[in-house]
């Protein structure tokens, strides 16, 4: 009977969130960008045409969303697949936000390359290579700035949708999850069909060792974990969530699990019913990962929604690469597409809009 009561309570919360998302006149999307020099490690990230270009991807993503072109580099960020390219997920987000007529705010949590658009800065430091054990130099500053903005936005809006753009983010997420004691090896997703789990684990273990962190025996707090093997977007998003008091859609996969783990570390009794994760079917069905297995370790009340844009029906060759395991998610794509669908768009209308934006 207690279980049935809890399930009914969850259904009420779900309906409440969906109703809020349908009816609210002023939801806002927050795209949090950052850099980790971990992305320069060969073979780790596909979020760019080369390792060097991964540092430009976050800035280019938001320039593309706002300006319709890129100023910080010569070409649009992309994943090269044979003779075609997989469009950046920022274009999926852009299409969905335009369809749903939702404004957005850019948050620079710590990007080495600064975008040529207006943004809110959470600090001047970008993320370092986590193998050093000093991945983020100013995690508390970023977190506190996130809390302040989260509180301010809660006074202006009824709902927040939060996404991130940071190449190698699944590796830094693995680092934070492991540092906080979660079993995440072989469970984080990635931007390529071949998920380099061994490389990710080796990178994280080297960082933990150099930070003198032993998760099995040490009582590691959230800022310590982020400072050692995290990236700037994680404390930024955790701060935004903790600082706010309104419903939130987290658009993403593995990185959002790490954010939830950080929140749980800071506030063990945090009410996760206020948070819903929305991600793509490409993450949810990733056979090389286990997002659900990670989330279950953190809190059973975290709700996750899966969005399928039906790219098997597209004639856009680049978008078809999502079906074979490239890219999968990023820049809040899952959350933005979920929002567009809840607010009245059909899947076909959404896909057609994405195709036009990606031309």
Whereabouts are the PLM-identified features?
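Single conserved hydrophobic/aromatic residue that forms the stacking wall/gate
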Residues: 1-12
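N-terminal loops that bind phosphate or other acidic moieties
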Residues: 11-161, 167-359
């Amino acid at each position: 009977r207690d279980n049935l009561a809890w399930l009914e309570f969850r259904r009420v919360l779900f309906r409440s969130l969906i109703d809020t998302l349908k009816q609210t006149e002023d939801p806002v999307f927050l795209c949090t960008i950052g850099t980790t020099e971990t992305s320069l490690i060969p073979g780790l990230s596909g979020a760019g045409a080369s390792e060097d270009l991964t540092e430009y991807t976050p800035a280019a993503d938001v320039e593309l969303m706002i300006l319709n072109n890129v100023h910080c580099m010569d070409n649009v960020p992309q994943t090269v697949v044979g003779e075609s390219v997989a469009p950046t997920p920022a274009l999926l987000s852009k299409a969905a936000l335009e369809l749903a007529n939702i404004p957005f705010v850019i948050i620079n949590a710590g990007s080495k390359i600064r975008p040529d658009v207006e943004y809110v800065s959470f600090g001047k430091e970008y993320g370092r290579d986590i193998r050093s054990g000093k991945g983020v130099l100013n995690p508390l500053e970023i977190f506190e700035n996130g809390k302040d903005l989260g509180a301010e936005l809660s006074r202006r809006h009824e709902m927040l949708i939060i996404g991130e753009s940071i190449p190698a983010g699944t590796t830094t997420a693995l680092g934070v999850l492991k540092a906080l004691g979660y079993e995440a090896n072989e469970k984080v997703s990635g931007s390529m069909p071949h998920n380099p789990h061994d490389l990710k684990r080796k990178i994280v273990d080297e960082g933990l060792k150099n930070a003198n962190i032993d998760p099995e025996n040490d009582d590691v707090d959230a800022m310590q974990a982020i400072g050692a093997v995290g990236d700037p977007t994680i404390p930024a998003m955790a701060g935004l969530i903790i600082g706010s008091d309104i419903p939130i859609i987290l658009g993403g996969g593995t990185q959002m699990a790490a954010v939830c783990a950080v929140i749980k570390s800071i506030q063990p009794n945090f009410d996760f019913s206020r948070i819903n994760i929305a991600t793509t079917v490409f993450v949810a069905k990733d056979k090389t990962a286990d997002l659900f297995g990670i989330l279950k370790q953190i809190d059973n009340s975290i709700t996750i929604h899966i969005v399928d844009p039906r790219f098997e029906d597209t004639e856009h060759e680049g978008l078809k690469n999502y079906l074979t395991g490239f890219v999968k998610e990023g820049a809040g794509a899952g959350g933005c597409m979920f929002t567009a669908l809840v607010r009245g768009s059909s899947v076909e209308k959404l896909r057609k809009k994405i195709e036009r934006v990606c031309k």
